[in-house]
Amino acid sequence: MATGKIIQIIGAVVDVEFNQDSVPKIYNALEVKNKQYKLILEVQQQLGSGVVRTIAMGSSNGLKRGLIVTDLGHYIKVPVGEATLGRIINVLGETIDNKGALKNNQSDKIEYWEIHRSPPSYRDQASCREILETGIKVIDLICPFSKGGKVGLFGGAGVGKTVNMMELIRNIAVEHSGYSVFTGVGERTREGNDFYHEMNDSQVLDKVSLVYGQMNEPPGNRLRVAFTGLTIAEKFRDEGKDVLLFIDNIYRYTLAGTEVSALLGRMPSAVGYQPTLAEEMGLLQERITSTKNGSITSVQAVYVPADDLTDPSPATTFAHLDSTVTLSRQIASLGIYPAIDPLNSTSRQLDPYIVGDEHYETALGVQSILQRYQELKDIIAILGMDELAEKDKLLVSRARKIQRFLSQPFFVAEVFTGFPGKYVSLKDNIRAFKGIIKGEFDDLPEQAFYMVGSIEEVIEKAKKL
């Protein structure tokens, strides 16, 4: 293995000099190791005369010029397979949950894969029209997820992206008994801790691999941690399993790329983002795909800066998604959770050829009633309800019931709301909304529709009011 020495350190950027005949390749992992220190660097640029510019995967505190650096001769490698289930690892595949080294039940040997891999060839890729039931009413009705598809949860700060993601993991792990990989990219350490304990309490931890690179980590770490999680998911997929990949938050991945780009001296583009924004997003998203062996269904939380969906980061992410779930601050302010906007959320799966005519017509009926209610709100605010035609009064009444019925108590939020969590099957979901549209429940008070699961619970609640 070739060795070099550190000649310059500027924060997370470290320049290393090698002999000209043994210069490491781009993205190779380099190791700095002495009695006090062990740090992995990733090669980003070859500057000429044997010098490479690298990004540190950990803190560069304590580094000094002249330290010996070893070229490991490969990209960063991480453990994959069932040994990672129920454990928390970092970007380098090291355990950070104080439970000791990874153990493999089936054999002593744990497999390691490089995090930089090519996407599957066109010949190996496969598409699937099967719907993935989540048990969340508004998602299953308005923006259904496809097995092997990509879903984005878009929302500003504090509208419920992480809570929605935790509920999806809980529902899919409990109801569908599949494997999940959760990748925390630049998010709060507290949330990562809460998430671990929530999964443990729900008894689904043994089906989830957790990969964390939190917001206190250097930018190189946050830029690569999504690839670590994806590599673990790819291993499960190639073993013939249907795996769920959760990334929270894809915006922090973009932000880490912006920081690295600035550190490397690249000229920024629109709104200060890196000039390679579309390419970096594509590198990650193109690998999240299904093959003939198994599928990867990905759910990605996307922070929307200043609630502006035209910002380059969320706008670039949009192009890669099959379903977009948009969380609205306006709906959250009404106390309706999950605060998903049914008029701004879309799915390619909402097609009569895929979901069937009944589901498609019910979803469109719900959206048209809510859209008409939205248009009438200005008239109601100025003139009041009494000035509306009888037909519109009835429509407003149904719209308010639909709006409240789209709320749902979550299992992961039981401690905050005091309501026990509910899972609603797609069949019951369609039947209930179809009934509301047809006016079967016009005689029930609208408060009976708030924070319940099925329509039977609405009828029970109405009797007590």
UniProtKB/Swiss-Prot annotation:
Instruction: State the SMART domains in the record.
Output: AAA
The name this protein goes by in its record = ATP synthase subunit beta
Could you name the domain of life of the organism this protein comes from? Bacteria
Its biological purpose: Produces ATP from ADP in the presence of a proton gradient across the membrane. The catalytic sites are hosted primarily by the beta subunits.
User: Which Gene Ontology MF annotations are present?
Assistant: ATP binding; ATP hydrolysis activity; proton-transporting ATP synthase activity, rotational mechanism
Q: Write down any Gene Ontology CC term.
A: plasma membrane
Which family, according to UniProt? Belongs to the ATPase alpha/beta chains family.
> Which residues does the record give as ATP binding sites?
155-162
Q: Where in the cell is it found?
A: Cell membrane
